[in-house]
Amino acid sequence: MTESVLDYMTRLGRAAREASRVIGRASTAQKNRALQATAAALDEARDELSAANALDLAYGQANGLEPAMLERLALTPARIDSMIVGLRQVASLADPVGAIRDMSYRPSGIQVGKMRVPLGVVGIIYESRPNVTIDAASLCLKSGNATILRGGSEAIHSNRAIAACIARGLAEAGLPAAVVQVVETTDRAAVGALITMPEYVDVIVPRGGKGLIERVSRDARVPVIKHLDGICHVYVSAHADLPKAQKIAFNAKTYRYGICGAMETLLVDQTIAADFLPAMAAQFREKGVELRGCERTRELIDVMPATEDDWHTEYLAAILSIRVVSGLDEAIEHINHYGSHHSDAIVSDHQSQIRRFMAEVDSSSVMVNAPTSFADGFEYGLGAEIGISTDKLHARGPVGLEGLTCEKYIVIGDGQLRGHA
């Protein structure tokens, strides 16, 4: 690449800004044609995708990439199938762009309401998983946004092959190629450039490790949609159905250890701890989960001692911290102090207790008699998600199509003048 990284990224940004005006006014039918054509292109390019992915896997193995990272990097036939299905699912979703709500007449005679519109240009920074290229591109396209995708250097060949399929889909729908651009350089300076171009980029979505997200949050001059940690809790109250609670807690932890909605700390009311914990601990041990507990927990079951650091830790592994609490007040206090505002659950049949938990736990998702593993855009009926936000401005929780849009006021009159009867 002869031009500098900054010049290259500026060129991408300028092209994305111009393309955003085209995709922003594209019809739903045209956007869906692009998605369906991209799905067909992926299906036809399976051999090319597998060959490109093999290059990335070989490079990763030669450079000591961890097995978990290699697993996320692999584009298996099943994952290609999943990408194709995902594109078709997004095409089937309702288009939020242009929806108008809350139209009402004011005393002056004007009508005031809100219209949903695209954000503009979305920059997405992610690691390892090449399927994110399709997930992100499809959601941004359907919501009327141009996007710049900066994947990890370990997936560069896979991402280029996927980008070629997206370009075919856009061309078949008569849309400019710059609607979806994949950053072709592996130079890390590209990230710094992307997050500091507010004239071209409207929002950044980082998806990856804590280090990446902290860097983007610290250095960005563009608004960021993100979450740092998924320190999720399940509180089993004194009013819980204990067999139900055991099933919920087990699923919350063991459905998948590596998801951000996995339970990391189990809180148990002191009045039922002696009845609940022995059977619960036995089930976790049978699954191979390492248990750590507070002093009161260790009086009831044989577990390793939990330290202060454990309450702050997102394990993303088969490790669970357990704390016995005096009641609802201590459970809420613990969650709001140690939690990451992601997803937290209560198991209880007491309605006033449930209402307090829902109102007072400061998290983007609050579950009642359901595991935190449900924290997912597909499970919420969004069809897909670009990520999960634990922030409070713009989007909170799983971010789907609507989260990639915003609202503007529309005002309709018939010649009324302010200050005139």
From Swiss-Prot:
Q: GO cellular component annotations, sorted alphabetically? A: cytoplasm
Q: Which GO terms describe its molecular function?
A: glutamate-5-semialdehyde dehydrogenase activity; NADP binding
The first-level EC class reads oxidoreductase
Its Enzyme Commission number? 1.2.1.41
User: Which cysteines are disulphide-bonded?
Assistant: none
PANTHER family noted in UniProt: DELTA-1-PYRROLINE-5-CARBOXYLATE SYNTHASE, GLUTAMATE SEMIALDEHYDE DEHYDROGENASE
What is the protein named? Gamma-glutamyl phosphate reductase
Q: Which organism is it from?
A: Pseudomonas syringae pv. tomato (strain ATCC BAA-871 / DC3000)
Upper lineage ranks?
Answer: Bacteria, Pseudomonadati, Pseudomonadota, Gammaproteobacteria, Pseudomonadales
